[in-house]
């Protein structure tokens, strides 16, 4: 993941940024991305659902390949953010998590499986994290 590129794009966001698709406010999107980062960091352990257990391994490449994620894709239920959040607090938290990844946390990724795709390597997690951030930054036009 290129932390500089991501944080420069995040710096283009404001608390008034409007999504090009979806219903999340920008502060909710930042909190959602942070909640997603908590999974590979080992701070959250969402359970695997039946659908993920059945087809997750077959769909796994969509998480880390070069194709963009589709708009309005369903998400992990435990990282849906629907309450009000403080823009600057959420932005700072996400920037801290990005810095943790950039400083070698990928070697310490949790062995807990992704709740849909299952077990991922550190490289797959890294690509998927970037892809997820890129998806949501594009959602807000940056």
Model regions and ranges:
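Short, helix-capping/interhelical loops that line the mouth of catalytic, cofactor-
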Residues: 43-89, 104
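Onset of an N-terminal alpha helix
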Residues: 1-7, 26, 130
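Charged/polar positions within long, soluble alpha-helices
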Residues: 99, 103-106, 138-142
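A non-catalytic, amphipathic alpha-helix used as a structural packing/dimerization or gating element
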Residues: 89-96, 131, 135
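Short amphipathic alpha-helical segments and their helix-coil junctions
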Residues: 5-16, 34, 38
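Short, contiguous alpha-helical
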Residues: 18-64, 112-142
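Globin-like tetrapyrrole-binding proteins
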Residues: 1, 9-13, 21, 67-68, ...
